[in-house]
Amino acid sequence: MRELTSMQAACWIGRTAHAALGKVSAHLYAEFDGHAIDLERLRAALQQVSLLHPMLRLRIDQDGLQGIAPMEQAPRLEVDDLRGLAEPEVAQRLLRKREAWTHQQLDLRHGCAARFSVSQLEGERSRLHVDTDMIAIDPSSLRVLMEDLARCYEAPDAPVATPPSFFAWWDAVRADPALKATQERDRQWWRARLDSIAPAPTLPLLDVQPAQAHSQRLTTWLDANQHIALRQLARERKVTLSTLMLGLFASALGAQTGDRQFRLNVPSFWRAPLIDGVERIVGEFANVLIVDVDLDAAPDIAALCNQLAKTTAACMAHSAYPGVNLMRDLSRHHGTPQLAPVVFTAALDMPGKELFSPRVKNAFGPLGWLISQGPQVALDAQIACADGGILINWDIRLDALPEAWVTQLFERFVDLASEVARQPATLDQALPRAPEKRPLNPLQQAYLLGRTTQMPLGGVAMQEFREYRGMMDSAVLRSRLDAMVRRHPSLRTRIDADRRVQYVSDEVRLNLDEVDLGHLPLAEALGVIDARREDYAHALSPLDRSPWNVTVFHLAHGERVVFVRLDALILDGRSIATLLVELFEGQLEETPQVDTGAPKADQTEQRTADAAYWNTKLAAVDGAPRLPWSVPLDQAGVARYERQSLVVPRETFKKFCMVGARQRLFKNTTLMAVILEVLSHWVSEGGLCVAVPVAPPSDAAFANRSSFLAINWNRAAGSFAERSAGLQVDVLEGLQHLAYSGVDLARQLFERHGPGPVLPVVITNGFSWPVAPSDSAMRLQGGLTQTPQVAMDIRFWADADGALQLDIDYAREVLAPALVSDFLGTLGRAIGQIAGAGEFALAPAALIDTDHYRLNSPVEAACRDGYLARIADHLFTPGNHKTALISGERRLSYSELGDGVARIIAALRARGIGQGQVVAICLPRSPEHTMLTLACALTGVIWVPIDVAAPAERRHYLLENCHPDLVVLGQAQTLEQPSTTCAALLATPAAAPGHLADLSLNEAPGYYLYTSGTTGKPKCVVLNNRATANVIGSTLAEWRVTERDVFLSVTPLHHDMSVFDVFGSLAAGATLVLPAPGEDKDALRWNQLVAEHQVTLWCSVPAILEMLLACRGEHGLQSLRLIAQGGDYIKPAVIAGLRELLPQARLISLGGPTETTIWSIWHEIGADDRKLIPYGRPLPGNRYFVLDAQGRHCPVGVVGRIHTAGANLALGYLLDGALQQSDFITVDDEHGQAVRAFRTGDCGRYRVDGTLLFDSRVNGYVKVRGVRVSLPDIEMVLNQHPALRHVLVVDYGEPRLGEVCLGALYVCDPQAAEPSMAELRDYAREHLPHSHVPTRLLGVAALPLSQNGKPDRRRARELLSAPATASVRDKVLAIYLQVLGHSNEAGTDSAVDFISLGLRPPHLKAVAAQLQAQFGVSLSPGQLLRCRNAQEVERLLG
């Protein structure tokens, strides 16, 4: 087995490569039309030739090495007998066979390098089909093969000398030291010229190439006289005939493409004479010469031929280094794949002159068809001697090149060759001079880049599409268009994308297409047009011509529909409008002067000054507008655009402009200000920076000289009138600073605020653009503009009647049509409002459609449930033996529970504790905690649950702040406040209390709950029974709770959701199960309790529910009929698991901060809630508003801060015993009425159906495992550590999936000793609640900062989210496996769920001990219980 040659390797790879023009084999297919072929003689000849030439049996193995297959695999003659078939059938079969053989790939893996077949035809006619793979048999070898085949056929018994093998020659080549030295010399020669090698010809390659190749040929024959004339001319000019034809081809190709310099692929088949008889070898000897063509260096074709003769000779002299290797070097040099897709193959000066000898013709008939394919070859122009003349045979890839274009090139070449044969002086005629080429300006280059798909919202051309309909004579339209192309250089401007230059062609080319639909009924014809509209509007105009197109659809009765598409590479908006008026109305503006392209004055100083101006001006910009994008802009793909429009009547628009004029505002400023003000309602936060196209006045030829300004609209700055005046100043100032272009601005903004488009909103002023008269015969029907990286282009102009036309072209991938429609409708109302009132002011309440608030309800709709009276009735009705509480082995009936409550009521009264006084409950979960809570609630005593697990310092603050009259403890201890134990309160028997006033609807303070704050201390929320009654009553009714239900209390008792567990269950007369002491965090035990007591209702934060599910084991939880989650993100994956586990259970999402009493919004999770669980709709008597930073109501889909109002509002906060109202504010509702509301730390957005969706949190609040946490609080505490200088705390993970952790980056004080990780973690646990302790602590040299000097939280999240090292995870996993008694021989993954390995809570003590021994970090079993796998344990280890 031997290595492949460079050419063989390239062809082998090209068979499967997915690069351009790949996926074909390099093979040559020929047909010979003969007479009376003797099949047996041919079979014998083929057998003999297979012995002579082993390369017919070439085999390539899986390692890419070549060898020879045994003779058993030699090609066999195939026969197709088509005699007796009808002539049309014969023709069809032959055509199908030609098509199949043209595109086949011979099976070289099994030694099939050639294929032979005979089609037998009537009248003893036959056709010999021969297909050879060029990896084994190059074109020069095909001549040898066919000659030997004919010789063996002609004289079967004549001896034929065996030629040497190709492998012998190839071994000699590889071993020859002189050839190796020559190859290295030539490699260095080519390497020194890599920079100067010309580019590939500019071919109009099809944008979308089919999956399968499609090759076809164009062919003609120059007769013997022409052959003689050309050969005589070549001798006279001292060049070979091949060089003469190469010069003619290069001239024709340059004229067709417009290229002045390009490279051609010129094959050579020279065989190094290293062994005797090399000329008789059949094998692969091909090389490619990369020949440069420079038309600018040749005044005429004769000079071009001389140039090419010298260039080709130089290439030949250095051809020891393979051309395939050279192209590979060129690709590496440029960093992109380099091709030589145009091949020129000449066989005019070979021995014997003719392509095939008379012997071959006599044996098999004349050559009737010849075609080849080759990887990365789009056009192979072959020239050969045949039948005394010259055969011109071009093989073309029609899956890559337009047939019309290549046919035109073919005819151009044939005409030129014929003309030169007839008139030799043609060689001396001057070649057309190259048009002046000018570099593309930055905007044009940006538009070219936008045509690619490598950027978000790319893959589009910046172009304008318009559609007209009416009556117009086609001849008139064609005549006008012809005149316009002649008159306006822009319509002849070509763009060279490879060289980034533009030039004006002398060719008057009408990019006019006509489609005749006159034979169709009108409705059907319009349907055809409708089907073509979108693709036409989005198509990228090819750059092998000026990028514009006019397509005329001819309808019945002389009516026309005209599509027009013009690219901004050559024209700006005003130029387009002007040209279309000229086309359809015949109205000409004064003839613009030709732009000579003279160099402009040096603007270096002006540019520097303008850059400084814009740097200051844009300092306040905080990134792209935060509109309700359907997908993040930096993740958007290729854009497709749609248009929505609005027409404002002339009178309304006139009044509107007059109002603006009284403010000394231009018409465009007035309208732009209203657009920006209205659009700002859809911005969730930050500013609104938009691009405004501008074009300096010019009397030069139509072109695109536009740029754009960046205008920042700050809705918080001053009044609307003041903002509008500032807008006008900004635009006028911007026009004075255009030396710093719009592209410069975009680049500057991208560097500050990328990735993704930074100016996705454009406002285009078309007031100065010409328009057609209202009675035009061709009426504008619509249009579409698209711009790379632009999501919304708001365009305005006035029609001939003075009506305002507003068009919004938007990328539908990132903007919902309903949103655009809402904005357009609001914009129309705003214009009407100003015009009608005559005042330049906007009333947002009258503008924004607030129908999405329709599920809000007034306070009067709140439920007035006497829940406390019902609880008292259940407790104190004699003989009520229904089970009320279960805790471990204890089962308390309602009567027994009532007895305890009665004792505590009596004991409190004995201590003088009554209505309005405060009792702090410092007890673990237990029946006693429940008794004390009920005793206080029933008598009007304000009860305050205190987290007994909180650090001592925090507990001290909680008690000190609420000023308790009594603190009830589990064990006696000394406190600053009066205190007692619960046992003491229960010690004395007492009768059931007498009449208790029903305080269910009392609006006085009923209880306090602590929640996270932003001041470094928890906030004490003051709640009342009236709000609680609404939640209890509404929920019991909605969930249809009865005395048969069983609740399980697992939510911490200082958390608001626990209030429903206690009061909801007991008000319904149901049973409440309490985990026994030590079982609060034992999820395995919870599962047992659910099964043991047939729990029917589960209500908790998502993290607790996930613990239950993770430890489910053999328990099916089948008794649960309703599962409610709230207080944190609900994972869709968990919901999907619940649907599968409990398909009949109701699944409920609950929400609302503690300040709105337990929960104030809910949503029953349905089958459609898969990717995102909605926040829901408010409870009765509540209203949820979404407001922006200015307190304005946000439209549908816009993220704003959530404000709640209504029956569930808390009374305020308790600070040092006094009621405070921070965050309880007054806002205007949708009707403009002032209402008290709570400003939450949450952001959300409404759906059209009135459902609220949660979006994010503000002011440093996050939710972690259901607990609201203030990040600044944690930073404040950690910053007090004496060894730390800076701390930055962030949440990381995926909040929308509920995967949220706290992480802290810290910088140590260089003057202090660096603390250990264990020390920092212990400090955090000592000073922070458990829920606030960071999962991961990471030391850094400096905190990451954004470009504006603020903490870079995004980068912090990246650092904290970095994958843990596998070694740590492996050690953690090994510890768990050891404790569980497993080995890791099977390679258990570190992401495996511990529960699936059999982990149970009793194992965790041993795990914790080993982790401390291994890592020096003390983790409690409770902490480890929440870790599902080794990766999560690794995070705890820091």
UniProtKB/Swiss-Prot annotation:
GO terms for cellular component: cytoplasm. InterPro entries: AA_adenyl_dom, AMP-bd_C, AMP-bd_C_sf, AMP-binding_CS, AMP-dep_synth/lig_dom, ANL_N_sf, CAT-like_dom_sf, Condensatn. Pathway: Siderophore biosynthesis; pseudomonine biosynthesis. The lineage of its organism: Bacteria, Pseudomonadati, Pseudomonadota, Gammaproteobacteria, Pseudomonadales. GO terms for biological process: amino acid activation for nonribosomal peptide biosynthetic process; secondary metabolite biosynthetic process. This is Pseudomonine synthase PmsD. Belongs to the ATP-dependent AMP-binding enzyme family. It catalyses: holo-[peptidyl-carrier protein] + L-threonine + ATP = L-threonyl-[peptidyl-carrier protein] + AMP + diphosphate; L-threonine + ATP = L-threonyl-5'-AMP + diphosphate; L-threonyl-5'-AMP + holo-[peptidyl-carrier protein] = L-threonyl-[peptidyl-carrier protein] + AMP; salicyl-[ACP] + L-threonyl-[peptidyl-carrier protein] = salicylmethyloxazolinyl-[peptidyl-carrier protein] + holo-[ACP] + H2O + H(+). Residues 3-427 are annotated as: Condensation 1 (Cy1). The keyword Repeat applies. PANTHER family: NONRIBOSOMAL PEPTIDE SYNTHETASE, PYOCHELIN SYNTHASE PCHF. Gene3D superfamilies: 3.30.300.30, Chloramphenicol acetyltransferase-like domain (3.30.559.10), N-terminal domain of ligase-like (3.40.50.12780), Nonribosomal peptide synthetase, condensation domain (3.30.559.30). Residues 460-695 are annotated as: Condensation 2 (Cy2). One of its GO terms (molecular function) is phosphopantetheine binding. Keywords: Hydrolase, Ligase, Multifunctional enzyme, Repeat, Transferase.
